[in-house]
A protein has these predicted regions:
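Extracellular jelly-roll beta-sandwich "head" domains, especially the C-terminal globular C1q domain
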Residues: 1-134
Length: 134
C-alpha cells in the first residue's frame, strides 16, 4: 500500500487520501487525492482520521465555486503526543458539485507529519468516510 502524505501537510494544505475504499454510487466522487465532489445538494456526515506526529488541528473545507472555505465548526485537534486526529461533522451543501477537503488550517503554526506506520510495521491509511444523509 502506498503511504499517505509522504511529505508534511503544510498550513493551508489539504490532506491526501490516496487509497480508495468502498463506494456506493455517483453522489460522492473523488476528483483528486484530496478532493471529493458532493454532486447533490444535501447534508453529509463526514468522518475522518489522520495519524500525525505532532500537535495540530484539521478542518473541513467546502468549495462551491468561489474557492475553498474552512468550516470553523468542524475544527478538531490534539495538544500533545503522536496519535490520531479524529473528527466527525455534518456539512450541508447549497449548490451541486461542492468540493470537500480535509485541511491543516491556514492559521496553524506548523506543518503536520502524517505517520505512515503508526503503532507497528504495517502501513496505515488516513481515513475519510462521507455519507449523504439528507
Amino acid at each position: 500500500m502506498p503511504e499517505d502524505n509522504s511529505a508534511a501537510v503544510a498550513q493551508g494544505t489539504d490532506v491526501s487520501f490516496p487509497q480508495d475504499g468502498p463506494n456506493s454510487g455517483a453522489t460522492i466522487v473523488r476528483t483528486g487525492g484530496s478532493t471529493f465532489n458532493l454532486t447533490a445538494i444535501g447534508t453529509y456526515q463526514v468522518l475522518f482520521q489522520v495519524s500525525v506526529d505532532e500537535a495540530g488541528q484539521l478542518v473541513l473545507t467546502l468549495n462551491s465555486g468561489a474557492g475553498a472555505v474552512e468550516q470553523p465548526y468542524t475544527v478538531v485537534g490534539r495538544a500533545t503526543g503522536t496519535s490520531q486526529i479524529v473528527g466527525m461533522a455534518l456539512v450541508t451543501t447549497t449548490v451541486v458539485n461542492t468540493i470537500l477537503t480535509v485541511r491543516n488550517p491556514a492559521g496553524e503554526p506548523t506543518a503536520l507529519t502524517i505517520t505512515p506506520s503508526a503503532g507497528g510495521t504495517e502501513p496505515v491509511s488516513a481515513h475519510l468516510v462521507i455519507m449523504q444523509i439528507a
